[in-house]
UniProtKB/Swiss-Prot annotation:
Belongs to the UPF0014 family. InterPro entries: UPF0014_fam. The chain crosses the membrane at residues 3-23, 32-52, 57-77, 91-111, 117-137, 214-234. This is UPF0014 membrane protein YjkA. Keywords: Cell membrane, Membrane, Transmembrane, Transmembrane helix. Its main location: membrane. GO terms for cellular component: plasma membrane. It is found in: Cell membrane. Pfam families: UPF0014. The lineage of its organism: Bacteria, Bacillati, Bacillota, Bacilli, Bacillales. The keyword Membrane applies. It is a multi-pass membrane protein. The gene is yjkA.
Length: 250
């Protein structure tokens, strides 16, 4: 696709702007900002990746992954609803998930240690974990607020902080994983995933594209569960005081 063809796809943005204006949705400004940011960010990352792919040095790969982790963690904690999250807890959770998934893929020689493989797969894993982290923390924050009396009752009966919040953590984990699981159930029937579509458009054999897509599906499923479990372990102690009481501002 050349830049002329790409510019013609702006028709879809104009359609969205027209509909927003017609129905008084009031999101025209957000659409314009989102479009400009997406175009600029993707073009910049495209040129950066071209340089990294040419160098293909582990240090450049590591720096790129660290940047993705930092941006993802910041995006999660900047949401006002995630009041019980912190940058370093989220960053640590995302980093652990990345280390585990990439460690397995590289140690079993499923993918080679090259930028062309590690960076795109890391982006998908971190992106999926970022969404899961946001959903999990939102759900946990809301559940703690609604079930505060239940937590305090269990604590008053001699229960530990972990016991008082275990059911809430389980519920938050289940609800935050539902979108990922439901999306995976319809792969190939309702939607063709991004990596598979991209490879097919680039001329790859469809079966080869399916293999890589299944790699992503299995990896994101594991990363989803890992993200929730690690965030549970790292986050729940922050809800309680040193005297094992629920913090009043939660």
């Amino acid at each position: 696709m050349d830049y002329l063809s790409l510019s013609l796809t702006m028709i879809f943005v104009l359609i969205a702007l027209f509909l927003s204006k017609s129905f008084k949705a009031g999101v025209e400004k957000d659409m314009i900002i989102a479009t400009i940011r997406a175009a600029v960010q993707l073009l910049i990352i495209g040129y950066v990746l071209s340089l990294i792919f040419r160098g293909d040095h582990p240090v450049f790969i590591l720096l790129m992954v660290l940047l993705m982790l930092a941006v993802a963690a910041q995006n999660v904690i900047k949401r006002k609803k995630n009041t019980i999250g912190s940058f370093w807890r989220v960053f640590a959770a995302l980093a652990i998930v990345e280390i585990v998934t990439q460690g397995i893929l590289l140690s079993l020689h499923i993918i080679p240690l090259t930028a062309r493989y590690v960076i795109p797969i890391s982006g998908m894993v971190i992106g999926n974990s970022m969404v899961l982290s946001s959903l999990f923390l939102n759900r946990l924050n809301s559940e703690v607020g609604v079930r505060k009396e239940e937590i305090q009752l269990i604590l008053s009966l001699g229960g530990t902080p972990k016991q008082s919040i275990q059911r809430i953590l389980t519920s938050a984990m289940k609800m935050s994983m539902i979108p990922t699981l439901e999306s995976q159930k319809t792969l190939g029937l309702v939607q063709l995933p991004g990596m598979m579509t991209g490879q097919i458009l680039a001329g790859a054999d469809p079966i080869q594209a399916v293999r890589f897509q299944l790699l992503i599906v299995f990896t994101t499923m594991a990363s989803a569960a890992l993200t929730c479990v690690i965030l549970s372990v790292l986050t729940y102690p922050s809800l309680f005081t040193v005297h094992q009481q629920l913090k009043q501002n939660e």
